[in-house]
Amino acid sequence: MSSIKTIVGNIDNTVLSFTVGNDVVLDKKLVDFDCISTAAHAYMLMQLPKNNPIISKEEFNSLLISLNKIIELNNEKKFKIKEVDQDVHMAIEKMITKEHGELGKKLHTFRSRNDQVATDLRLLAKKELIKTVDVSLSLIKSLIIFAKKNKNVPMVGRTHMHPAMPSSVGLWASAHAESLLDDCNCLFSAYELNDQCPLGSAASYGVPFKIDRNLTSSLLGFSKPTHNVLYANNSRGKVESIILSSMSQVMLSLSRIAQDLLIFTMPEFNYFKVADNFLTGSSIMPQKNNLDICELIRAKSSSVKSCELAIYDIVKSAPSGYNRDLQETKQPFFEGILTTISCLEILTSLIYTLKVNKNDMIKAFDSKVFSTDRTLELVAEGMSFRDAYNHVKNNLDDLKNIDPREAIKNKTHLGAPYGLDWSYYTVRTNQISKKLKKEKINFERKISKLLDSPYKVI
């Protein structure tokens, strides 16, 4: 069996292919972040030791030019990671060494691929969480616009999928918006846990030299470095599963919106109308217009959850310290993020096309939907609730069908159809937008300053 020479030694060809796996493809997502973390690490090396720095100012400036060039090549899809490179880290080191000789050989001083990839993944996660909150806000805003526009349109409220009580389109749409507002809090919680820099923890056990981990953490826009160097590496996989757990909550909200739309756009209901260009057809049935988008979102909510659980299962029995098992967490991590963002984007576009069929909404009401309203009228007249309940239950056929537009006007308490406080949604949305803007600007400023080149998250 033949071997091939790599930066870390001679490896059998078959072993190399097996161990590299899909990293030559997956690691393309990490190229920018590996360049960014390398710049921060090199800046620290420029400070150590003070009397004779490992990297000179001139070398650092030359390095920045090369790292920005690699980022540009990657954005143009021209940067290549070969199997012999094994991963993005060695591919970049090889290119820097080819261009700058000794400088490239110095870059791995005090650094392991273990803390290197952990840092890259956390940088990627910062960017993707910011983007996820941003697109979540877009969907929230579209739902609130739709809700306010149709706030007084009556809609049969359902429990167990059967008609229950008078409700409104405004209540339905804003309920889903409120769910997503809570999901944004979950995303920010994951962001806070992720916002710690593992760089400098090396292979899990630190290095015998007083490096400045606070410096690299600050340069990269993290709120702080991870403390324990062993946990810095042990947290890999755990942090990714937490991030996907927050995204699973987003997908749970999207799945329920999708399911409602699938039901309420059926001809039997015809409550809502989706733009024709958001529907697909059948290869054999000419009349079909299918809301495949919502069916796929419903299924993809399970896909994202499975990505989260895949990562959890990979790391749950791993011993302390780095283990190659972690390589298998990349694909589900990237897939879960991409799926969540794409579902948010497509559903936002769909909501903006959504129309309400008011007449069909009103026709859906029958007298029994007002059973609870009638029961509470009798209570207001002096009858005990249970007696009123039994009286109405025993005389359902005698109930009168009233105008649902008038019925929902009686529900004025906090959070009811006519008691919705629209400023509540404005305040919460603005709070999230403000926090998002702060994190986005801080991250962009830090990375732009480090690279001496403009960097945009979104």
Q: Where are each of the predicted segments found?
A:
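A helix-coil-helix interface module used to build multimeric assemblies
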Residues: M1-G206, I211-S218, T280-G281, D292, ...
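Glycine-rich cofactor/substrate-binding loops
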Residues: M1-S37, E102-L103, N270, M285-I458
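Charged/polar positions within long, soluble alpha-helices
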Residues: Y43, Q47, E72-F79, T97, ...
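Short, well-ordered beta-strand elements within core beta-sheets of diverse protein domains
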Residues: Y43-N52, L171, S241-Q249, R374-E381
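Short, exposed beta-strand "edge-strand" segments with a Pro/Gly-rich flavor and a Y/T-containing core
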Residues: P49-P53, K82-E83, D115, Y205-I211, ...
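A general structural motif at alpha-helix termini
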Residues: L64, L220, T265, D276-F278, ...
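A short structural micro-motif
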Residues: I65-L73, N234-G237, N394-L399
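Charged, flexible cofactor/metal-binding loops and thiol motifs
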Residues: R122, K126-L129, V133-D134, K148, ...
